[in-house]
């Protein structure tokens, strides 16, 4: 936002120069982007009056004038401007004056006529880049006065780059309040008396969409004269704020916007049929805007309409049909509060960005509408005349923002800032910022003013106190913290252990989104009910993941499409399960998962090339389980899991609870997800593997070990893991190693049976085992297998 420094100093005038003021604003969070002069450098230009104006005898486009600049003699000046005429006040560059560009005025003759000076245009004085003809000054401009002094051109234009949360400073009133607080001085409050209605004309107002517009004020002004020019003082303030003068009505609404920070709009009263309705746009409704462009309105767009048509896009842009023209004599003045949520993003959807939308998106003071309409009314009556009707207000009080009370604790303030600020200073800062403050028990209770949409929590108040107090005023103190050594639980396994294990086995860690494509997730987990986001980034990221598989498989497919022959990815993260008993109805479960496909090993002359299979992923899973030093508590069963191949999948159980799965991706799922080659996956809940059995110190036996091999026949459906578990239980302390070294099916074996060759290693720590001891253990093992699995020794 650009503004005139002199205009600001009319409201509050601290005893500091421009540079100090700019630095002060920047340090308070209102960053100054630049400071430029209000006009180019020139001197010797006075206010003059055209007392004679005649045609040049030898040139059709030139006029010979006599100008009164307050001296003893009139100045003869030849002028070519078409608007030069008798009686107007003008800017006169006298002989010796120096204009921008080091242009010096000298005595001259133009087509034989003497010219002792020059009548200046705005462009020639570097005041404006636009304008036709010479400057026309107000009729009450004092002749002979230095133009720089008269127009207050020894001024600076300050450009501040405000953050989106500081919409309250998008007006001179808000900026003055900030400067007053920063310098601990009072602000000259603008007194805005109510304008007495002199006519009874009014327009009915209906709030159809109360949530988007809870307050709307309208006032009829009749009999305005738009042939009147906008006063130069207002034109100059608008210019220095980067706003071009258009006509008196538009200029007044723009002036109020810049002064109070409140957007306004004026309608041609004769274009309004019936009354005003503030509603959402109808399907297919169109509107021709003031710039002549026609737009098709979205149904989510709030519009100002009469009983038959849309008149304007609320808070953004007016319509051409109801716009004020030079033929307008009666207007309806609008002053409204629009909910920032209703305006945010609407302007961009139509390719627009206006001063009004810029402010309404950030939040306009919802208590300012009456002051704004009274201020605009008074200015209009002063400039263009007319008669004002009563202010008509439609309000949904329950839909207006509520006053928020925020508590600031002394302990919290000191801890965050790291410095003690006196109670009186804190109270003064908050009070000057407009907060209604109550001091109680080492804390402050502050009612947030209606113009501060950005203050909602305690940290917001701390920020306000700190920035006004001045960050440079807070002493530099090195942070101190007590370091308390935390005890390390040896039974807890660090996540890095699992990561390092997988990396050592050729995996690379991936990080995928928690938001996944619900269609892809349904392919892998058709029975799971996903948590659908109400406002997703995109349709492809609209569901919370119920496992890591959708994200990992999407990454695998991405890498396959880039010709990667060997892919091994793993991820640690959360899966999100719907659970009514959990906090917010969501159970967040930490898991670790992985996917593999392609070659089992990189190409090498020693090993033959082969693709990964079920036992590769099983080995990786067992490597993770082995970190717990308690493999016996895990039970692996051949069971089908969602999205996995029915003949190549397994489920991991701990104490009867499912804690993980692994296996081959189902061919149908593989095809649906555009994945080539056989792919294997695994996922384990971290709660099942994050604790380990601490290793117990035991002496190394000095007695010999004995190996006995047994070959048994069992039905093909018998789980080998169950057999090994049973042997471990019956083997006792003397069984120190157990190994399945052969599985055979085929010739010599009955159909539906398999042969298992198992090596038992027996050893004692206190004696040499005798043959009878060894046979006793082996016989117990064989008997147990026969009893539990109907196993028999193979001949």
From Swiss-Prot:
The gene is pheT. It catalyses: tRNA(Phe) + L-phenylalanine + ATP = L-phenylalanyl-tRNA(Phe) + AMP + diphosphate + H(+). This is Phenylalanine--tRNA ligase beta subunit. The keyword Nucleotide-binding applies. PANTHER family: PHENYLALANINE--TRNA LIGASE BETA SUBUNIT (PTHR10947:SF0), PHENYLALANYL-TRNA SYNTHETASE BETA CHAIN AND LEUCINE-RICH REPEAT-CONTAINING PROTEIN 47 (PTHR10947). Keywords: Aminoacyl-tRNA synthetase, ATP-binding, Cytoplasm, Ligase, Magnesium, Metal-binding, Nucleotide-binding, Protein biosynthesis, RNA-binding, tRNA-binding. Residues 701-794 form the FDX-ACB domain. Gene3D superfamilies: 3.30.56.10, Bira Bifunctional Protein, Domain 2, Ferrodoxin-fold anticodon-binding domain, Nucleic acid-binding proteins, Phenylalanyl-trna Synthetase, Chain B, domain 3. One of its GO terms (molecular function) is tRNA binding. Belongs to the phenylalanyl-tRNA synthetase beta subunit family. Type 1 subfamily. NCBIfam families: pheT_bact (TIGR00472), YtpR (NF045760). It comes from the Bacteria. Binds 2 magnesium ions per tetramer. Its cofactor is Mg(2+). InterPro entries: aa-tRNA-synth_II/BPL/LPL, B3/B4_tRNA-bd, DNA-bd_dom_put_sf, Fdx_antiC-bd, Fdx_antiC-bd_sf, NA-bd_OB-fold, Phe-tRNA-ligase_IIc_bsu, Phe-tRNA-ligase_IIc_bsu_bact.
């Amino acid at each position: 936002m650009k503004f005139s420094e002199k205009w600001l100093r009319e409201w509050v005038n601290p005893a500091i120069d421009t540079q100090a003021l700019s630095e002060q604003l920047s340090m308070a969070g209102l960053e100054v982007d630049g400071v430029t002069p209000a006009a180019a450098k020139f001197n010797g230009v006075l206010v003059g009056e055209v007392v004679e104006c005649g045609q040049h005898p030898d040139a059709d486009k030139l006029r010979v004038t006599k100008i009164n600049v307050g001296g003893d003699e009139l100045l003869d000046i030849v002028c070519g401007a078409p608007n030069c005429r008798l009686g107007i006040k003008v800017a006169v560059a006298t002989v010796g004056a120096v204009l921008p560009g080091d242009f010096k005025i000298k005595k001259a003759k133009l087509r034989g006529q003497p010219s002792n000076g020059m009548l200046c245009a705005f462009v020639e004085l570097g005041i404006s880049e636009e304008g036709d003809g010479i400057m026309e000054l107000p009729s009450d401009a004092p002749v002979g006065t230095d133009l720089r002094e008269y127009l207050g051109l020894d001024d600076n234009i300050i450009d501040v780059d405000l953050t989106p949360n500081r919409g309250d400073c998008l007006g001179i009133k808000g900026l003055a309040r900030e400067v007053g607080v920063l310098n601990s001085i009072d602000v000259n409050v603008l007194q805005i008396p109510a304008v007495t209605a002199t006519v009874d004309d009014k327009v009915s107002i209906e709030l159809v969409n109360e949530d988007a517009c809870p307050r709307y004020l309208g006032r009829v002004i009749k009999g305005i004269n738009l042939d009147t020019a906008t006063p130069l003082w207002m034109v100059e303030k608008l210019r220095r704020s980067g706003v071009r003068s258009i006509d008196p009505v538009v200029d007044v609404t723009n002036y109020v916007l810049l002064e109070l920070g409140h957007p306004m709009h004026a309608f041609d009263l004769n274009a309004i049929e019936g009354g005003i309705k503030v509603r959402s746009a109808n399907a297919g409704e169109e509107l021709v805007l003031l710039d002549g462009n026609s737009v098709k309105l979205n149904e989510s767009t709030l519009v100002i309409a009469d009983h038959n048509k849309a008149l304007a896009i609320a808070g953004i842009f007016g319509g051409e049909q109801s716009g004020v023209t030079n033929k307008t004599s009666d207007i309806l003045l609008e002053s409204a509060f629009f909910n920032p949520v209703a305006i945010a993003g609407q302007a961009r959807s139509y390719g627009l960005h206006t001063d009004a939308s810029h402010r309404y998106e950030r939040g306009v003071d919802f208590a300012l509408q009456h002051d704004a309409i009274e201020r605009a009314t008074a200015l209009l009556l002063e400039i263009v005349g007319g008669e004002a009707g009563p202010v008509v207000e439609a309000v949904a009080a329950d839909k207006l923002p509520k006053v928020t009370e925020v508590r600031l604790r002394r302990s919290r303030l000191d801890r965050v800032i790291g410095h003690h600020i006196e109670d009186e200073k804190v109270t003064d800062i908050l009070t000057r910022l407009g907060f209604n403050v109550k001091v109680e028990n080492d804390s402050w209770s502050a009612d947030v003013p209606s113009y501060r949409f950005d203050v909602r929590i305690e940290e917001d108040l701390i920020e306000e106190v700190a920035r006004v107090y001045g960050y440079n005023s807070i002493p530099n103190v090195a942070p101190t913290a007590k370091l308390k050594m935390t005890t390390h639980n040896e039974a807890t396994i660090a996540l890095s252990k699992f990561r390092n294990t997988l990396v050592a086995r050729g995996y690379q860690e991936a990080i995928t989104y928690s938001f996944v494509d619900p269609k892809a997730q349904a392919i892998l987990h058709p029975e799971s009910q996903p948590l659908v986001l109400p406002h997703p980034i995109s349709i492809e990221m609209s569901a919370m993941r119920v496992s890591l598989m959708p994200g990992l498989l999407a990454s695998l497919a991405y890498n396959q499409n880039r010709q990667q022959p060997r892919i091994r990815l793993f991820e640690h993260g959360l899966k999100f399960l719907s659970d009514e008993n959990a906090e917010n109805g969501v159970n967040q479960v930490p898991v670790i998962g992985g996917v593999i496909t392609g070659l089992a090993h990189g190409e090498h002359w020693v090993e033959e090339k082969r693709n990964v299979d079920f036992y590769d992923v099983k080995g990786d899973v067992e490597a993770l389980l082995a970190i717990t030093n308690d493999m016996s508590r895990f039970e692996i069963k051949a069971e089908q899991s969602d999205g996995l191949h029915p003949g190549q999948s397994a489920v991991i159980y701990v104490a009867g609870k499912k804690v993980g799965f692994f296996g081959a991706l189902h061919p149908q799922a593989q095809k649906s997800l555009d994945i080539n080659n056989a792919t294997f996956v695994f996922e384990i809940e971290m709660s099942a593997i994050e604790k380990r059995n601490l290793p117990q110190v035991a002496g190394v036996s000095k007695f010999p070990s004995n190996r006995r091999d047994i070959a048994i026949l069992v039905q093909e459906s018998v789980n080998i893991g169950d057999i090994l578990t049973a042997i471990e239980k019956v083997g006792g302390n003397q069984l120190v190693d157990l190994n399945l070294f052969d599985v055979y099916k085929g010739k010599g074996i009955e159909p539906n049976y398999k042969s298992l060759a198992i090596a038992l290693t027996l050893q004692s720590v206190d004696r040499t085992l005798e043959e009878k001891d060894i046979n006793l253990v082996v016989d117990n093992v064989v008997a147990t297998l026969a009893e539990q699995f109907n196993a028999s020794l193979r001949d």
